[in-house]
Every structure is written in C-alpha cells, then in structure tokens.
C-alpha cells in the first residue's frame, strides 16, 4: 500500500520544523492526516486565456477542502503565443513548455504533494503540465480555462464570425482600409478564454478529454459560460477521491500513466486527426508520451492518419466554425462518439471520471446520451465583451445533431477519408514532417514549385510583403527548428501574409520551424532533421524544385542523391560555419542557448536530452 507522499513532511518528531511551517500556512493537527493536493494555476494578466483564472484556483481549493483534502495553490508562467508572434518573443514560446513542466515538478516534489489539479489553458501551458503529470505520475486532473467566444462583425448586412487570424489577415491586406482593419481588430477577440478556433490551446484541451485526464466539456465549453464552473467544482471533489483510491486502496488505475497509456494516446491522436487539430499537438503528444515512458512515435501518428477520417473542420480550416459551434454539436464527446461508431476508439481506456472512456462516450455523446449531456452542450455564447469567467448563462434553442452535413460528421459522411493531419517523408524530411491536411485546399494536395529560400522568419515576412514570392512558389524557411532558432518559432505571420496577398491557394510554405494552430493552407512544418542538425533542408538552393504529394505522404527536393551528397560535402567543408544561416543577426540569450544545447528533433517532440550532458562529462 503506497504511503501518502505528504507524510514525509507532516509525520514524525523530526519533522517538527516542517509542521511548524505548514501551520504558518493555516494548517492544524487535523490536516496532517489528509491528502495534500497541489493546484498548479497559470493565472496571468498577459494572456486572455488566463486572465480569468485568478480566483479559480481558490474555487477548486474550497471544494478540495470540503471533500476532506488540504489544497495548496501555486502558479506557473504562461506565454501568449499571439502576442509573442512575429518578433523575438516567439523564440521563448516552446522553451517555456519545459520550464512549466519543471516548475510543476519542482513545486510538487519539493513539498511532497499527494495529487495535482492542473488549471491550464493556452498553447504551452497545457502541454507543459501534461508532461509534468506524466513525469510525476501522481493522481492528476486537468481543468482548463475554456475557449473564447468567437468575434462577430457585420459584412454585407450579415453577422459573421471572426478570430485572431481574421484580424491578422485583414490588417496585412492592402485592399482593406484602416477603418476595416480597426473594426476587425476590435471584433476578433471579445472575451477571456483561449482563442476561439481549433488552434493549439483548444486542441490540447480537447486532447486531455480523450486521454481521460479531464472532465467532459473541458475542451469546448466556453470560458464565459456559467456551466463551466461545474468543471472546477467537480475537479476539486474528484481529485480527493482519486488520491484516496490510490493511497488508501492501492488503486494504481487512477495514475496518469495508467489512464494515459499507449491506447489512450492512440485515442487522443485519433481525435486530433479527426478534428484537424493544430500541428503543434504532434510535438506535445510525443513529448508527453516520452515523459510517460511510452514508445509512441511519428510512425504511430502516420499509421493513425491513414485510417482515421476528418470528421470536423474548425477555424482556421474553415472561417465560419469555431469552438462554440463544436460544443453545440456535442463537443469532444460527440467526435469521440462518431469515432467509436466507426470502431476507431479503444473503449476500455480509463478516465478520471468514468470507469472507461467507452462508458463516458455512452453517457456524454449527445447522439446516445440523455438530457444531462444535451444540457451540457446547449451552453451558448453570451455575445458580451468580458474578462470574467462564468459571466453568462445563455443557451442554444437546439443542438446541431446533423451528422451528415453538420459541424461533426459521421465516418460515412466525413470531410475526407484521410484525417486532418498527415506525416510526410522524403529526401528533405527523412524523419518526417507534419501538415494539417484539413486546412489544405483539395486543388493543391499535390504541388510542385521552385524554392524561395529564407533563413529566418523575419526575412520570409519581408520577402512575402515585398512581392518576392509569386504564385507557384514554395517558400522555404530554415534554421528555425528547435536548435536552429532556437525555440522553433511559429510561422503564423508568413502564412497569414500569403493569404493577404492572395497566394493562400497557389503557394506552399515548408519549414523546420512550426506553425501556429491558426495556420491553414499548404503549410508543412517540423521538417526533420532540421537544418541546424544537418538536415537536407539546409542543402536546398534557390530555385530547386520542391515536390509535395500529400495523398502519397511525400516531400522531396527533385535532386539526385549524388547532387545532395556533393552539397553536403561542401557544407561540411565550411567547418564552424556549417549548418548555420549565412547572414542572420539574432540575439540569443543565455537561457535560449541552454535550451538549444539540450533540445532534440521535432520528430522526438523537441524534448530535452540530458544524456548529451552526461556524455560530455
């Protein structure tokens, strides 16, 4: 029978000093026998997805204590990728994931907490906390801040939906007036919450449901809706129950690695492919699997992408569907239900709220569940600008239950037989590359064009806005991988500017960097190995023909092996200047240099490899 971890610091005469300090936090004699539950909050006034979280940690804390536990809250950092986008701030986004994972580990292990509630929301916070949960392997529940309401604006007498990407594209469109750009800017992000499309934040919060680590509705129930409060209340009670089951009943089935096993990761990836989630989710699932000591790889993602259909298209893949629309159609349990009917879900995986994910689907899929499920998914946007959580209680008059032409489709009515994400391989992507196929127009699934080479995101932006890119070109941005950036910047501005220039359906963009969840179009990222690690993307020259074949999962430069080997020899002959951008001025801080020294390929989730340090001793 496992002992409560917290008793290391609360029991025994020699822990009098520690107990004295615990008492100074408000604990008394009766508390020293209770489970101590850590609450990892991520409140910050920098990020709209986190601005409303300040009081939610204490909401969970009150419920934990009512359930018989002791709650102790702490905070992590949280970077807003949208605000950090397009300048040097983006170098810090992916590295912050590792810092968040470490911060949670440090606080939980330093204070011997027994269990964990993760209050996350945006791009790197949920992945960082997920990595920590798998690393620590103590009872854990995720409850996120929830999605933002979609923006609304009037055009041609009609009300239309908008989001951050809409504002960026309009601002860069020379045919739009300053007034039009200002209207879109003020309309795009009306409330607190994670940006309203199927971008990275919402994708990851949806995946925690499929992994079994979050309650139904976590990924799609709006931040502003009063119903979301229930998730925080239930999380507080449920985590105490999980802690008691593990420490008092020796039930290892409640641990993250048992809930989030290999089959659960397959479920999560199948959901991701079906809903056309952000390509960043591939990085994060690979990283979390590594922390869980699972052999879940790009090969598994490739295998799943060939059998799981695309059942849902959400912004940025389409402009008129946002998370609030997914929720009205049944949310993540609705998509999992459609996958289940097609035999594409492992029903026997455990969850933190039901015995199995199969039982959860039976209860919460609106196509088979009862009134409780229908009530949950009737929560609607309030249409009022606010930064307050749970501030409105509007409901839809009806749900979207159309599985033929609705927001969520059944497998027989899928948007495409192949899923919304795909892994490509070829002579410039020996270890793979990722594309969000859900966002690619059918006319350019097969594409060839001359490479237009840029060795930084900044140069690519200047080239696109300076009309150096034409229809039919392949924009190639390199030395932006995990090591080469460092930090693997997102290329949202280049892809958005291609759209604003009218090139969104006539150009491709390939990179060893990554993309925002807001990116759509023929955008291929995570090319591995990256240029800074000797990847062949570093050997491509201006005008070389790039061949893309998504149906056959191919990405190549049309050069023979002898030519590539000759170029590789010439590159290696440069000595210390080899595999570095020819002319790029970029200040790289000591913190980022430390990240670059330990990080690994995108094909491995860009996780740290500390054996590099051990080998150097």
From Swiss-Prot:
SUPFAM superfamilies: IlvD/EDD N-terminal domain-like (SSF143975), LeuD/IlvD-like (SSF52016). Binds 1 [2Fe-2S] cluster per subunit. This cluster acts as a Lewis acid cofactor. Pathway: Amino-acid biosynthesis; L-isoleucine biosynthesis; L-isoleucine from 2-oxobutanoate: step 3/4; Amino-acid biosynthesis; L-valine biosynthesis; L-valine from pyruvate: step 3/4. It catalyses: (2R)-2,3-dihydroxy-3-methylbutanoate = 3-methyl-2-oxobutanoate + H2O; (2R,3R)-2,3-dihydroxy-3-methylpentanoate = (S)-3-methyl-2-oxopentanoate + H2O. It comes from the Bacteria. Keywords: 2Fe-2S, Amino-acid biosynthesis, Branched-chain amino acid biosynthesis, Iron, Iron-sulfur, Lyase, Magnesium, Metal-binding. Disulfide bonds: none annotated. [2Fe-2S] cluster binds at residues 122, 195. Homodimer. Functions in the biosynthesis of branched-chain amino acids. Catalyzes the dehydration of (2R,3R)-2,3-dihydroxy-3-methylpentanoate (2,3-dihydroxy-3-methylvalerate) into 2-oxo-3-methylpentanoate (2-oxo-3-methylvalerate) and of (2R)-2,3-dihydroxy-3-methylbutanoate (2,3-dihydroxyisovalerate) into 2-oxo-3-methylbutanoate (2-oxoisovalerate), the penultimate precursor to L-isoleucine and L-valine, respectively. This is Dihydroxy-acid dehydratase. It comes from Acidiphilium cryptum (strain JF-5). The lineage of its organism: Bacteria, Pseudomonadati, Pseudomonadota, Alphaproteobacteria, Acetobacterales.
